[in-house]
Amino acid sequence: MSAPIAEAVLRYAGLGVAPFHTPGHKGGRGAHPLLRRFLTDEGLAADVSLSAELDDLHAPTGCIRAAEDLAAEAYGADAAYFMVNGTTGAVHTMLMAALSPGDTLLVPRNAHRSIVGAMILAGVRPVYLQPEVDQRLGVAMGVSLETVRRAAEAHPEARAALLVYPTYYGVATELGEIATFLHGRGMLLLTDAAHGAHFAFSDALPPSAMAAGADLSAESTHKLLGSLTQTSMLLARGGRVAAERIRAAAGILQTTSPNELLLASLDLARAQMAEEGRTRLAAVIPLAEELRRRVGEIDGLWTLGAEHMGLPGMAALDATKLTVQVMGLGMTGFAAEGVLRQRDIACELADARNVLLLLSYADGAREIEHLFAALRALAQEHPPRCTARGEGTSFCTLPPLPQTVPSPREAYFAQHECVPIGDAAGRTAAETIVFYPPGIPVLAPGDAIDTETVAYLRTMRRIGARVVGAADATLETLTVIRDL
Protein backbone atom coordinates (compact mmCIF):
# COMPACT_ATOMS: atom_id res chain seq x y z
CA MET A 1 0.00 0.00 0.00
CA SER A 2 1.49 3.33 -1.08
CA ALA A 3 2.35 5.96 1.56
CA PRO A 4 3.61 8.96 -0.45
CA ILE A 5 4.74 11.23 2.41
CA ALA A 6 6.51 8.51 4.37
CA GLU A 7 8.25 7.28 1.25
CA ALA A 8 9.40 10.78 0.27
CA VAL A 9 10.74 11.58 3.74
CA LEU A 10 12.67 8.32 3.99
CA ARG A 11 14.02 8.82 0.49
CA TYR A 12 15.38 12.28 1.37
CA ALA A 13 16.74 11.15 4.76
CA GLY A 14 18.65 8.36 3.02
CA LEU A 15 20.39 10.61 0.51
CA GLY A 16 23.11 11.68 2.94
CA VAL A 17 22.67 15.36 1.99
CA ALA A 18 24.53 17.85 4.23
CA PRO A 19 21.61 19.67 5.94
CA PHE A 20 22.33 23.40 5.87
CA HIS A 21 18.68 24.05 6.68
CA THR A 22 16.33 23.70 9.62
CA PRO A 23 15.89 22.02 12.08
CA GLY A 24 18.91 22.95 14.14
CA HIS A 25 19.68 19.45 15.41
CA LYS A 26 20.85 18.68 11.82
CA GLY A 27 19.49 15.22 11.30
CA GLY A 28 19.87 14.30 14.96
CA ARG A 29 23.60 14.74 15.44
CA GLY A 30 23.05 17.74 17.72
CA ALA A 31 20.06 16.34 19.59
CA HIS A 32 20.00 15.79 23.35
CA PRO A 33 20.83 12.16 24.22
CA LEU A 34 17.37 11.59 25.69
CA LEU A 35 15.75 12.95 22.54
CA ARG A 36 17.88 10.54 20.52
CA ARG A 37 16.66 7.77 22.79
CA PHE A 38 13.02 8.78 22.30
CA LEU A 39 13.08 9.21 18.55
CA THR A 40 16.12 7.11 17.51
CA ASP A 41 18.71 8.22 14.99
CA GLU A 42 16.51 7.13 12.11
CA GLY A 43 13.56 9.10 13.43
CA LEU A 44 15.59 12.27 13.93
CA ALA A 45 17.05 11.95 10.45
CA ALA A 46 13.48 11.99 9.15
CA ASP A 47 12.70 15.24 10.97
CA VAL A 48 13.27 17.52 7.99
CA SER A 49 11.58 20.68 6.76
CA LEU A 50 12.29 21.09 3.05
CA SER A 51 8.96 22.10 1.53
CA ALA A 52 10.63 22.58 -1.85
CA GLU A 53 11.57 18.90 -2.02
CA LEU A 54 8.95 17.37 0.27
CA ASP A 55 5.87 19.41 -0.69
CA ASP A 56 4.09 22.27 1.10
CA LEU A 57 1.16 21.50 3.40
CA HIS A 58 -0.44 24.85 2.56
CA ALA A 59 -0.25 24.45 -1.22
CA PRO A 60 0.38 20.75 -1.83
CA THR A 61 1.19 19.50 -5.30
CA GLY A 62 3.38 16.46 -4.61
CA CYS A 63 3.54 13.79 -1.93
CA ILE A 64 1.22 15.58 0.51
CA ARG A 65 -1.42 16.10 -2.16
CA ALA A 66 -1.13 12.45 -3.18
CA ALA A 67 -1.48 11.32 0.44
CA GLU A 68 -4.51 13.56 1.02
CA ASP A 69 -6.16 12.20 -2.13
CA LEU A 70 -5.62 8.64 -0.91
CA ALA A 71 -7.11 9.57 2.47
CA ALA A 72 -10.18 11.08 0.80
CA GLU A 73 -10.66 7.86 -1.14
CA ALA A 74 -10.31 5.72 1.99
CA TYR A 75 -12.86 7.80 3.89
CA GLY A 76 -15.38 8.23 1.08
CA ALA A 77 -14.77 11.98 0.99
CA ASP A 78 -14.25 14.38 -1.90
CA ALA A 79 -11.21 15.89 -0.20
CA ALA A 80 -9.06 15.38 2.89
CA TYR A 81 -6.88 17.98 4.60
CA PHE A 82 -4.08 16.87 6.92
CA MET A 83 -3.97 18.64 10.29
CA VAL A 84 -0.97 18.85 12.62
CA ASN A 85 -2.78 20.94 15.25
CA GLY A 86 -5.14 18.17 16.25
CA THR A 87 -8.87 18.11 15.80
CA THR A 88 -8.93 21.47 17.55
CA GLY A 89 -7.20 22.86 14.47
CA ALA A 90 -9.60 20.98 12.22
CA VAL A 91 -12.63 22.37 14.08
CA HIS A 92 -11.24 25.91 13.92
CA THR A 93 -10.56 25.51 10.19
CA MET A 94 -14.03 24.09 9.62
CA LEU A 95 -15.85 27.06 11.14
CA MET A 96 -13.54 29.65 9.59
CA ALA A 97 -14.09 28.10 6.15
CA ALA A 98 -17.82 27.45 6.36
CA LEU A 99 -19.15 30.50 8.19
CA SER A 100 -18.79 34.28 8.38
CA PRO A 101 -18.85 36.73 11.31
CA GLY A 102 -22.39 37.13 12.60
CA ASP A 103 -23.63 33.81 11.23
CA THR A 104 -25.82 31.69 13.51
CA LEU A 105 -24.71 28.15 14.31
CA LEU A 106 -26.77 25.41 15.94
CA VAL A 107 -24.42 23.65 18.35
CA PRO A 108 -24.97 21.18 21.21
CA ARG A 109 -24.04 22.17 24.70
CA ASN A 110 -21.91 19.04 25.04
CA ALA A 111 -19.58 20.28 22.31
CA HIS A 112 -15.84 20.26 22.94
CA ARG A 113 -14.13 23.43 24.18
CA SER A 114 -12.41 23.74 20.78
CA ILE A 115 -15.79 24.69 19.29
CA VAL A 116 -16.09 27.60 21.71
CA GLY A 117 -12.65 28.73 20.58
CA ALA A 118 -13.71 28.39 16.95
CA MET A 119 -16.79 30.54 17.55
CA ILE A 120 -14.59 33.22 19.11
CA LEU A 121 -12.24 33.16 16.12
CA ALA A 122 -15.00 33.15 13.51
CA GLY A 123 -17.35 35.58 15.26
CA VAL A 124 -20.19 33.05 15.11
CA ARG A 125 -23.32 33.34 17.26
CA PRO A 126 -24.38 30.04 18.85
CA VAL A 127 -27.85 28.68 19.38
CA TYR A 128 -27.22 25.98 21.95
CA LEU A 129 -29.02 22.66 21.64
CA GLN A 130 -29.86 20.46 24.60
CA PRO A 131 -28.55 16.95 23.97
CA GLU A 132 -30.46 13.94 25.19
CA VAL A 133 -29.37 12.89 28.67
CA ASP A 134 -29.11 9.25 29.69
CA GLN A 135 -30.40 9.18 33.25
CA ARG A 136 -28.57 5.93 34.01
CA LEU A 137 -25.18 7.40 33.20
CA GLY A 138 -25.91 11.02 34.09
CA VAL A 139 -24.14 12.22 30.94
CA ALA A 140 -25.20 13.99 27.76
CA MET A 141 -25.71 11.89 24.66
CA GLY A 142 -26.43 12.95 21.06
CA VAL A 143 -28.75 15.66 19.80
CA SER A 144 -31.93 14.23 18.28
CA LEU A 145 -33.41 15.04 14.89
CA GLU A 146 -36.44 16.59 16.59
CA THR A 147 -34.23 18.93 18.64
CA VAL A 148 -32.40 20.04 15.49
CA ARG A 149 -35.71 20.50 13.68
CA ARG A 150 -37.19 22.69 16.41
CA ALA A 151 -34.07 24.84 16.64
CA ALA A 152 -33.80 25.30 12.86
CA GLU A 153 -37.45 26.32 12.61
CA ALA A 154 -37.10 28.73 15.54
CA HIS A 155 -33.93 30.23 14.03
CA PRO A 156 -34.41 30.36 10.25
CA GLU A 157 -31.31 32.55 10.01
CA ALA A 158 -29.07 29.64 11.08
CA ARG A 159 -26.48 28.77 8.43
CA ALA A 160 -25.29 25.45 9.81
CA ALA A 161 -25.46 22.89 12.58
CA LEU A 162 -22.35 21.43 14.18
CA LEU A 163 -22.95 18.09 15.87
CA VAL A 164 -20.72 15.83 17.97
CA TYR A 165 -20.64 12.43 16.23
CA PRO A 166 -20.19 10.26 18.15
CA THR A 167 -20.09 11.56 21.70
CA TYR A 168 -17.07 10.84 23.87
CA TYR A 169 -18.98 7.83 25.20
CA GLY A 170 -19.42 6.43 21.68
CA VAL A 171 -23.10 7.27 21.19
CA ALA A 172 -24.10 8.20 17.63
CA THR A 173 -27.23 10.17 16.79
CA GLU A 174 -29.39 9.68 13.69
CA LEU A 175 -26.96 11.73 11.59
CA GLY A 176 -28.21 10.64 8.16
CA GLU A 177 -31.74 11.85 8.88
CA ILE A 178 -30.41 15.10 10.30
CA ALA A 179 -28.26 15.64 7.18
CA THR A 180 -31.28 15.18 4.91
CA PHE A 181 -33.31 17.66 6.97
CA LEU A 182 -30.59 20.32 7.10
CA HIS A 183 -29.71 20.08 3.42
CA GLY A 184 -33.40 20.42 2.60
CA ARG A 185 -33.31 23.81 4.33
CA GLY A 186 -30.10 24.85 2.59
CA MET A 187 -28.07 24.46 5.79
CA LEU A 188 -24.65 22.90 6.27
CA LEU A 189 -23.96 19.89 8.47
CA LEU A 190 -20.60 20.06 10.22
CA THR A 191 -19.41 17.30 12.53
CA ASP A 192 -16.90 17.00 15.31
CA ALA A 193 -16.10 13.33 14.68
CA ALA A 194 -13.04 13.30 16.91
CA HIS A 195 -14.01 9.85 18.16
CA GLY A 196 -15.33 8.48 14.88
CA ALA A 197 -12.27 8.24 12.64
CA HIS A 198 -12.49 4.43 12.63
CA PHE A 199 -16.15 4.21 11.57
CA ALA A 200 -15.28 4.17 7.87
CA PHE A 201 -13.52 0.82 8.26
CA SER A 202 -16.23 -1.39 9.78
CA ASP A 203 -19.87 -2.11 9.02
CA ALA A 204 -20.29 -3.17 12.65
CA LEU A 205 -19.78 0.44 13.77
CA PRO A 206 -22.08 3.43 13.20
CA PRO A 207 -21.91 5.00 9.71
CA SER A 208 -19.03 7.42 9.20
CA ALA A 209 -19.84 11.13 9.14
CA MET A 210 -19.07 11.26 5.42
CA ALA A 211 -21.34 8.28 4.68
CA ALA A 212 -24.12 9.88 6.72
CA GLY A 213 -24.01 13.09 4.68
CA ALA A 214 -21.85 15.57 6.60
CA ASP A 215 -20.42 18.44 4.55
CA LEU A 216 -17.29 18.79 6.69
CA SER A 217 -16.01 16.46 9.39
CA ALA A 218 -13.13 16.97 11.82
CA GLU A 219 -11.68 13.54 12.68
CA SER A 220 -8.98 12.57 15.19
CA THR A 221 -6.90 10.03 13.32
CA HIS A 222 -4.66 9.70 16.38
CA LYS A 223 -7.38 8.88 18.91
CA LEU A 224 -8.43 5.41 17.77
CA LEU A 225 -6.22 4.82 14.74
CA GLY A 226 -2.44 4.73 14.35
CA SER A 227 -1.15 8.25 13.69
CA LEU A 228 0.88 10.25 16.20
CA THR A 229 -0.83 12.35 18.86
CA GLN A 230 -2.05 15.77 17.64
CA THR A 231 -2.62 14.59 14.06
CA SER A 232 -6.09 14.75 12.53
CA MET A 233 -7.91 15.17 9.24
CA LEU A 234 -10.62 17.50 7.99
CA LEU A 235 -12.82 15.71 5.48
CA ALA A 236 -15.09 17.40 2.93
CA ARG A 237 -17.88 16.12 0.75
CA GLY A 238 -20.62 17.59 -1.43
CA GLY A 239 -18.93 20.80 -2.54
CA ARG A 240 -21.05 23.08 -0.33
CA VAL A 241 -17.90 24.64 1.17
CA ALA A 242 -15.34 25.85 -1.37
CA ALA A 243 -12.03 23.98 -1.31
CA GLU A 244 -10.07 27.22 -1.55
CA ARG A 245 -11.80 28.51 1.59
CA ILE A 246 -10.82 25.38 3.49
CA ARG A 247 -7.20 25.54 2.35
CA ALA A 248 -7.00 29.27 3.12
CA ALA A 249 -8.41 28.83 6.62
CA ALA A 250 -6.03 25.95 7.31
CA GLY A 251 -3.17 28.16 6.14
CA ILE A 252 -4.09 30.80 8.72
CA LEU A 253 -4.51 28.37 11.60
CA GLN A 254 -1.75 25.80 11.05
CA THR A 255 1.99 26.18 11.41
CA THR A 256 4.07 26.94 8.33
CA SER A 257 6.61 24.40 9.64
CA PRO A 258 4.64 21.17 9.93
CA ASN A 259 6.56 18.21 11.26
CA GLU A 260 7.11 15.65 8.52
CA LEU A 261 6.97 12.83 11.07
CA LEU A 262 3.44 13.89 12.00
CA LEU A 263 2.38 14.13 8.36
CA ALA A 264 3.97 10.77 7.58
CA SER A 265 2.13 9.19 10.51
CA LEU A 266 -1.20 10.37 9.06
CA ASP A 267 -0.21 8.91 5.72
CA LEU A 268 0.80 5.58 7.26
CA ALA A 269 -2.29 5.36 9.48
CA ARG A 270 -4.46 5.76 6.40
CA ALA A 271 -2.44 3.15 4.51
CA GLN A 272 -2.69 0.71 7.42
CA MET A 273 -6.45 1.06 7.76
CA ALA A 274 -7.09 0.94 4.03
CA GLU A 275 -5.15 -2.31 3.83
CA GLU A 276 -6.04 -4.12 7.04
CA GLY A 277 -8.41 -1.92 9.05
CA ARG A 278 -11.51 -3.99 8.39
CA THR A 279 -9.76 -7.19 9.40
CA ARG A 280 -8.30 -5.76 12.59
CA LEU A 281 -11.53 -4.08 13.69
CA ALA A 282 -13.43 -7.29 12.93
CA ALA A 283 -11.12 -9.01 15.42
CA VAL A 284 -11.44 -6.53 18.30
CA ILE A 285 -15.17 -5.70 18.12
CA PRO A 286 -16.38 -9.18 19.21
CA LEU A 287 -13.82 -9.12 22.03
CA ALA A 288 -15.14 -5.73 23.13
CA GLU A 289 -18.75 -6.91 23.05
CA GLU A 290 -17.90 -10.01 25.09
CA LEU A 291 -15.99 -7.87 27.60
CA ARG A 292 -19.01 -5.58 27.94
CA ARG A 293 -21.24 -8.58 28.68
CA ARG A 294 -18.87 -10.03 31.28
CA VAL A 295 -18.33 -6.73 33.08
CA GLY A 296 -22.07 -6.11 33.14
CA GLU A 297 -22.53 -9.37 35.08
CA ILE A 298 -20.28 -8.18 37.93
CA ASP A 299 -22.31 -7.11 40.97
CA GLY A 300 -22.11 -3.35 41.45
CA LEU A 301 -21.07 -2.56 37.87
CA TRP A 302 -23.25 -1.63 34.90
CA THR A 303 -22.25 -1.18 31.26
CA LEU A 304 -23.78 0.81 28.42
CA GLY A 305 -24.57 -1.50 25.50
CA ALA A 306 -26.17 -1.57 22.08
CA GLU A 307 -29.37 -2.84 23.70
CA HIS A 308 -29.80 0.60 25.27
CA MET A 309 -29.75 2.39 21.92
CA GLY A 310 -32.70 3.22 19.66
CA LEU A 311 -33.85 6.32 21.53
CA PRO A 312 -33.75 9.86 20.07
CA GLY A 313 -30.16 11.06 19.93
CA MET A 314 -28.96 7.52 20.69
CA ALA A 315 -29.22 5.66 17.39
CA ALA A 316 -26.12 3.48 17.68
CA LEU A 317 -23.13 2.73 19.89
CA ASP A 318 -19.45 2.36 19.10
CA ALA A 319 -18.61 -1.10 20.40
CA THR A 320 -14.99 -0.11 21.06
CA LYS A 321 -16.05 2.29 23.84
CA LEU A 322 -16.67 0.66 27.22
CA THR A 323 -18.58 2.82 29.69
CA VAL A 324 -18.70 1.26 33.16
CA GLN A 325 -20.93 2.79 35.80
CA VAL A 326 -19.53 2.33 39.32
CA MET A 327 -22.28 3.94 41.39
CA GLY A 328 -23.35 0.50 42.59
CA LEU A 329 -20.02 0.27 44.42
CA GLY A 330 -20.78 3.49 46.29
CA MET A 331 -17.96 5.39 44.61
CA THR A 332 -17.46 8.02 41.95
CA GLY A 333 -15.85 7.40 38.61
CA PHE A 334 -12.97 9.59 39.76
CA ALA A 335 -12.30 7.29 42.72
CA ALA A 336 -12.60 4.17 40.55
CA GLU A 337 -10.13 5.65 38.09
CA GLY A 338 -7.58 5.99 40.87
CA VAL A 339 -8.07 2.40 42.03
CA LEU A 340 -7.75 1.06 38.49
CA ARG A 341 -4.56 3.05 37.97
CA GLN A 342 -3.05 1.24 40.95
CA ARG A 343 -3.68 -1.95 38.99
CA ASP A 344 -1.86 -0.57 35.95
CA ILE A 345 -5.04 0.37 34.06
CA ALA A 346 -5.19 3.92 32.71
CA CYS A 347 -8.72 5.09 31.90
CA GLU A 348 -9.59 7.46 29.10
CA LEU A 349 -12.10 9.38 31.20
CA ALA A 350 -13.77 9.44 34.57
CA ASP A 351 -16.87 11.36 35.56
CA ALA A 352 -19.14 11.49 38.59
CA ARG A 353 -20.65 8.05 37.91
CA ASN A 354 -18.55 6.25 35.33
CA VAL A 355 -15.20 5.33 33.89
CA LEU A 356 -14.68 5.17 30.13
CA LEU A 357 -12.20 2.75 28.58
CA LEU A 358 -11.22 2.79 24.92
CA LEU A 359 -10.39 -0.27 22.90
CA SER A 360 -8.80 -0.06 19.47
CA TYR A 361 -7.57 -2.20 16.60
CA ALA A 362 -4.31 -2.56 18.59
CA ASP A 363 -5.94 -4.43 21.49
CA GLY A 364 -6.23 -8.19 21.76
CA ALA A 365 -7.32 -10.91 24.17
CA ARG A 366 -4.40 -10.38 26.57
CA GLU A 367 -5.07 -6.68 27.09
CA ILE A 368 -8.79 -7.27 27.47
CA GLU A 369 -8.27 -9.99 30.09
CA HIS A 370 -6.01 -7.64 32.04
CA LEU A 371 -8.74 -5.00 32.01
CA PHE A 372 -11.45 -7.47 33.03
CA ALA A 373 -9.37 -8.75 35.94
CA ALA A 374 -8.84 -5.19 37.20
CA LEU A 375 -12.57 -4.36 37.01
CA ARG A 376 -13.46 -7.60 38.78
CA ALA A 377 -10.95 -6.82 41.53
CA LEU A 378 -12.37 -3.30 41.84
CA ALA A 379 -15.81 -4.75 42.56
CA GLN A 380 -14.44 -7.34 44.98
CA GLU A 381 -12.57 -4.70 46.97
CA HIS A 382 -15.59 -2.38 47.11
CA PRO A 383 -18.69 -4.52 47.76
CA PRO A 384 -21.88 -3.29 46.07
CA ARG A 385 -23.86 -0.67 47.98
CA CYS A 386 -27.04 -1.20 45.94
CA THR A 387 -28.47 -3.91 43.72
CA ALA A 388 -29.96 -1.73 40.97
CA ARG A 389 -27.92 -1.43 37.81
CA GLY A 390 -27.99 1.71 35.74
CA GLU A 391 -30.01 3.52 38.40
CA GLY A 392 -29.36 5.47 41.52
CA THR A 393 -29.30 8.91 43.03
CA SER A 394 -27.56 11.44 40.86
CA PHE A 395 -24.28 12.86 42.11
CA CYS A 396 -25.06 16.05 40.22
CA THR A 397 -27.54 17.28 37.66
CA LEU A 398 -26.39 18.92 34.45
CA PRO A 399 -27.15 22.65 34.46
CA PRO A 400 -29.79 24.00 32.08
CA LEU A 401 -28.93 25.60 28.75
CA PRO A 402 -27.59 29.11 29.36
CA GLN A 403 -28.86 32.28 27.79
CA THR A 404 -26.18 33.80 25.57
CA VAL A 405 -26.56 37.53 25.01
CA PRO A 406 -23.22 38.73 23.67
CA SER A 407 -21.55 36.38 21.21
CA PRO A 408 -18.57 34.37 22.51
CA ARG A 409 -16.28 36.70 20.55
CA GLU A 410 -17.85 39.86 22.00
CA ALA A 411 -17.65 38.44 25.50
CA TYR A 412 -14.04 37.34 25.05
CA PHE A 413 -12.92 40.85 24.06
CA ALA A 414 -15.06 42.71 26.64
CA GLN A 415 -13.66 44.21 29.84
CA HIS A 416 -13.43 41.55 32.56
CA GLU A 417 -13.30 41.29 36.32
CA CYS A 418 -13.13 38.48 38.87
CA VAL A 419 -15.92 38.00 41.41
CA PRO A 420 -16.45 35.45 44.19
CA ILE A 421 -18.39 32.46 42.90
CA GLY A 422 -21.16 33.21 45.40
CA ASP A 423 -21.69 36.59 43.71
CA ALA A 424 -21.53 35.29 40.13
CA ALA A 425 -25.20 34.44 39.56
CA GLY A 426 -26.77 37.07 37.34
CA ARG A 427 -23.45 38.02 35.74
CA THR A 428 -22.15 37.14 32.24
CA ALA A 429 -19.26 34.69 31.89
CA ALA A 430 -16.07 35.89 30.22
CA GLU A 431 -14.15 32.61 30.41
CA THR A 432 -14.55 28.99 29.40
CA ILE A 433 -14.80 26.56 32.31
CA VAL A 434 -14.44 22.90 31.50
CA PHE A 435 -14.15 19.70 33.49
CA TYR A 436 -11.65 17.60 31.59
CA PRO A 437 -12.08 15.04 30.30
CA PRO A 438 -14.41 15.15 28.46
CA GLY A 439 -13.67 18.80 27.73
CA ILE A 440 -17.29 19.97 27.56
CA PRO A 441 -17.84 23.61 28.58
CA VAL A 442 -19.99 24.27 31.62
CA LEU A 443 -19.54 27.99 31.04
CA ALA A 444 -18.47 29.77 27.87
CA PRO A 445 -17.89 33.47 27.17
CA GLY A 446 -21.27 35.18 26.81
CA ASP A 447 -23.20 32.74 29.00
CA ALA A 448 -25.54 34.14 31.63
CA ILE A 449 -24.54 32.57 34.95
CA ASP A 450 -27.42 31.23 37.03
CA THR A 451 -27.67 29.61 40.45
CA GLU A 452 -27.97 26.10 38.97
CA THR A 453 -24.66 26.49 37.15
CA VAL A 454 -22.96 27.82 40.28
CA ALA A 455 -24.22 24.80 42.22
CA TYR A 456 -23.00 22.43 39.50
CA LEU A 457 -19.54 24.00 39.49
CA ARG A 458 -19.27 23.64 43.25
CA THR A 459 -20.45 20.03 43.20
CA MET A 460 -18.08 18.96 40.44
CA ARG A 461 -15.17 20.61 42.21
CA ARG A 462 -16.09 18.92 45.49
CA ILE A 463 -16.20 15.40 44.01
CA GLY A 464 -12.78 15.76 42.41
CA ALA A 465 -13.38 16.75 38.78
CA ARG A 466 -10.36 18.39 37.14
CA VAL A 467 -10.93 22.01 36.11
CA VAL A 468 -9.45 23.36 32.87
CA GLY A 469 -9.74 26.83 31.38
CA ALA A 470 -10.72 28.76 34.49
CA ALA A 471 -8.54 31.68 35.52
CA ASP A 472 -8.97 30.46 39.10
CA ALA A 473 -8.67 26.67 39.12
CA THR A 474 -10.10 26.51 42.65
CA LEU A 475 -13.33 28.08 41.33
CA GLU A 476 -13.42 30.36 44.35
CA THR A 477 -13.77 33.19 41.82
CA LEU A 478 -15.16 33.42 38.28
CA THR A 479 -14.18 35.81 35.48
CA VAL A 480 -17.17 37.82 34.27
CA ILE A 481 -17.87 40.77 32.00
CA ARG A 482 -17.42 44.00 33.90
CA ASP A 483 -20.68 45.84 34.46
CA LEU A 484 -20.68 49.29 32.86
Regions inferred by a protein language model and the residue ranges of each:
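Short acidic/polar alpha-helix capping motifs at helix-coil junctions
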Residues: G30-R36, A79-F82, S114, V143, ...
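Conserved PLP-enzyme active-site core in the AAT-like
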Residues: I5-L10, G16, A77, T87-E307
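Conserved N-terminal alpha-helix of the aminotransferase class I/II PLP-enzyme fold
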Residues: L44-G89
